[in-house]
């Protein structure tokens, strides 16, 4: 199809998720770690173009050479996509079509890359905790890659949340990084509750500097020196809901609620803060 402008390579695949490397016909654009692009495919009936935004991911390190990946040297974009139940209601889904792709298939990859879920060095952070549900790990991995590549003196804890049986497709890379970098910690957090009750309790313990929690993260969560980054399920995040103008409603659930109650503030385009988030499902 004329809309297609990129080739697909399946980097890793399981029943639950797939890592695609998308090689565009055009030169890859520079982007900030944590931002998102878009992928598109023609509908099954051939009469509609289905497009959706996806965060750009990163394998962080070459597992064979042990060299950190530098996105500026790449001729592809990497996407980490979670399988979702097929819905026959509402707009057509692109995800089931993505899971049918094979090496060499064509796809649309948008040239525009945007997003505010990025690491800003406007504060000399000593610690960063990144929490993502399922493939919400994608932008967090890109940010970890940026932090390690630039040799920033910062403690990093990267937490991936999922139910029993969920394992990050990047587990090998995380294991290698933990052995190579004393300031890097990856936690595969299992939470089978409907509303992330187990994660909430862990985070509450962590924010209270409970010994058991800080043993896992390997640093204390301190108000003036720690950046919190949250990506994925809105229920996990508890993001504020815009009511109009500058009026927001803050849910009484989620990690933002816990953080705000302990003095942390949300970062926006117009003011600084130590919570950054991006909700999607």
Regions found by a protein language model. Name each.
Residues 4-5, 53:
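Conserved beta-strand residues within beta-sheet cores
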Residues 6-11, 57:
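Conserved positions in beta-strands of structured domains
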Residues 10-12, 46, 69-71, 148, ...:
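Generic marker of residues within folded, mature protein domains
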Residues 12-13, 230:
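Generic beta-strand structural signal
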Residues 16-129, 262-266, 270, 274-281:
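FAD-binding FR-type
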Residues 93-281:
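FNR/FR-type flavoprotein reductase catalytic core
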């Amino acid at each position: 199809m004329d809309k297609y402008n990129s080739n697909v390579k399946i980097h890793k695949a399981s029943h639950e998720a797939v890592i695609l490397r998308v090689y565009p016909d055009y030169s890859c654009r520079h982007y900030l770690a944590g931002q998102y692009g878009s992928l598109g495919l023609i509908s099954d009936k051939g009469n509609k173009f289905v497009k959706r935004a996806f965060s750009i991911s990163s394998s962080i390190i070459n597992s064979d050479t042990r060299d950190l990946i530098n996105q500026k040297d790449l001729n592809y974009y990497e996407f980490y996509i979670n399988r979702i139940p097929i819905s026959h209601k509402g707009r057509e889904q692109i995800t089931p079509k993505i899971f049918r792709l094979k090496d060499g298939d064509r796809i649309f990859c948008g040239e525009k890359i945007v997003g505010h879920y990025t690491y800003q060095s406007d504060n000399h952070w000593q610690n960063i905790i990144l929490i993502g549900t399922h493939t919400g790990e994608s932008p967090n991995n890109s940010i970890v890659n940026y932090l390690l590549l630039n040799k920033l003196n910062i403690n990093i804890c990267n937490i991936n949340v999922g139910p029993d049986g969920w394992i990050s497709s990047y587990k090998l890379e995380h294991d290698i990084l933990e052995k190579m970098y004393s300031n890097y910690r990856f936690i595969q957090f299992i939470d089978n509750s409907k509303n992330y009750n187990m994660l909430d309790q862990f985070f509450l313990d962590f924010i209270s500097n409970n010994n058991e929690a800080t043993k896992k993260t390997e640093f204390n969560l301190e108000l003036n020196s720690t950046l919190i980054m949250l990506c994925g399920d809105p229920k996990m995040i508890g993001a504020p809901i815009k009511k109009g103008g500058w009026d927001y409603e803050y849910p009484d659930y989620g990690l933002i609620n816990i953080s705000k109650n302990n003095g942390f503030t949300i970062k926006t385009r117009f003011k600084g803060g130590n919570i950054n988030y991006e909700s999607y499902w």
